[in-house]
């Protein structure tokens, strides 16, 4: 169930939002687009610093999702990185890594310089 992984899902969506913008209002907007797609009411995780171990633990938890929920989560990730109409190289690399780790195809995305 999606509700069992709200915390790890929130962490990944929050990280994607933070990578996409330095402005907190834009991060919150991007995060909310992804959270709406994901479902439920996970709140954005404030990231003081990047922690690879925490990200790996979150992805380990998300690996247990059903294929349908995994695709919905990747779609939520895509909603975050596309919220501002631009896809940076860093956003693309991160979402591609998440999708690869979860064994799920990405929807069509094109990086913008």
Give the residues covered by each predicted segment:
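Small-residue-enriched hydrophobic alpha-helices in membranes
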Residues: 1-113
């Amino acid at each position: 169930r999606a509700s069992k992984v709200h915390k790890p899902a929130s962490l990944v969506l929050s990280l994607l939002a933070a990578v996409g913008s330095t402005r907190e209002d834009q991060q919150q907007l991007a995060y909310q687009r992804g959270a709406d797609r994901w479902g439920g009411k996970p709140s954005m995780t404030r990231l003081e610093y990047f922690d690879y171990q925490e990200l790996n633990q979150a992805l380990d938890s998300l690996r247990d999702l059903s294929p349908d929920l995994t695709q919905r989560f990747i779609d939520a990730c895509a909603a975050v990185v596309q919220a501002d109409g631009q896809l940076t190289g860093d956003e693309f690399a991160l979402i591609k890594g998440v999708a690869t780790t979860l064994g799920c195809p990405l929807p069509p995305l094109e990086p913008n310089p």
